[in-house]
Structure formats: structure tokens, C-alpha cells
Amino acid sequence: MSTFIQIPNSISQLTSKSKLEEIFTYAAIRSQIKDGNLQAAFPQNQLTELVGVNDRSIRNYIDTLENFGLIINTTKKHGYGEYAHNVYQLEYLNKEYFIMNPSLITEQGISPKLKGLLMLIKANCVKGTNYLEFNSK
């Protein structure tokens, strides 16, 4: 697992009502990348616990993230068919991303919605800084 988590700045362009939870869900999935292959396995029941919503909401968030092109829900052949096993293929980020400390994912004193808001603010900051341009006119 890497020291920091890369989050694309494009995540700020999500438009749904639950975009803060979707941003946090994406970061939680991305935090599970191991050995640099850009695949993350995260059981849905653990994800629902972490985000604090029901299974249906998590499925909706993942569908939104897939439609936005941030994750690919991979399926594996098993027995007589193909099944999704909560393994997600993530894109390689070579520019236009920010990094965050993975301890934010497991921080107990902050709600998932507030964590998503913090990431949304960071995605809109000037690249490489914590400076948010604001024009008062």
C-alpha cells in the first residue's frame, strides 16, 4: 500500500446530490490498492460500514463512479458464469491529481460526508498548494 492516496482533481466535477459520499467512497476504494497494479479489492459490507450508508447507496455510488470513468468494476469467471467480486480497476494518474494521507479514511472523529467535503475543497485548490482561489467580484 502506498504512503499517500492519489485522488484525481476531476472528482470535483461529480454532480449528484450525494457527491461528498461518492468522493469518500472513491478515496476508500483507492486506499486499498496494493502492489502497484491499480486494482483494489474492498468487500461491500466493509465499505458500507466505513461510509455509513446502506448497500443500495453504495451500489449507486459505485455505478456513478463507473459512469464517470473513475473505476471499472471487474468481473471474474467463476464456475458457470461471471461474477463481480468487488475488485475495482483504477486508472493511473499521471497529472491533475492531489495526494492525501490515508489516515483520513479511518479517522473516527470526522463524518464521511465531511471527509468528502475536505477532498472536494482540496480538488479545487491551486495545484500543489492548499490555496483556494476566490474572486469576490
Q: Which stretches of residues belong to each language-model region?
A:
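A generic structural-conservation signal
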Residues: S57, T74-T75
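Short recognition helix of helix-turn-helix/winged-helix DNA-binding domains
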Residues: M1-L50, E66-I72, H78-S136
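Short, hydrophobic-biased segments on the C-terminal half of alpha helices
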Residues: R59-D63
